[in-house]
Amino acid sequence: MALATRTDRNPSRTVQHPSKRDRQPKRDRQSKRDRQPKRDRQVSVPRLFWRSTVGKKTVMAVSGLIMLGYLVAHMMGNLKIFFGADEFNAYGHWLRTMGAPVLHYSWGLWLVRVVLLLAVVGHAVSAYQLSRRDIKARPAKYVHKRPRSSYATRTMRWGGVIVGLFVVWHLLDLTTLTVNENAQAGHPYENVVATFSTWYGNAVYIVAMLAVGLHIRHGFWSAAQTLGVGSATRERILRAAANGLALVLTAGFVSVPVAVMTGWVS
């Protein structure tokens, strides 16, 4: 049996056998330690940025601005319906041929859809994670009375849900023509008139556009705060711009179903 220690002629002196680790050269141990991966070095800068609260707010703000730009362009395209069927149908054809001849048929439209989808996903995920982080940071309810917030602020989350459900309905209605009974492929003007000739089509669209307006009013101002306002004067200007932009977009979108209901567009 091998013993860990042995005693020589001097009983008071005990000699210990060196362990396997002690017999290993110090240089080899150091090189082995250096070869081990360090977790801190594996985390990339984009991942650190995304994990931070500022990063999530920035993603939410930038994606919101992308969607806002799309809404402005979409509203301007919708208003072409007031110039007649030929003008509106030509606009629908241009959407599928934009970028030609460099891009193939509908490639430009699909590129816009992909960018918009990424913006929607980034906006929704960052909003959800920020909400969960805020709840975890304040698990207990405050006893004192919370400051009064605007109606748009209190309904921000539900407004996002309403808009998300409307997007699904809108695609099934005017893109895939699944729920539009009187739809005709290749006739966007007639399809819009058919949709807004029903009470439920008008109800769904108008409620959704009101939710969009409230969401834009609060979201535009929140994005400005996240990206930096700068001064009190600029703050007042951006707040007025948020209110005006929400009003113009809501009125522009709602004007189309109202025009169909009143017979202005038929």
Please annotate each region the language model reported.
Residues 2-266:
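Membrane-embedded alpha-helical bundles that constitute the cytochrome b-like, heme-associated redox core
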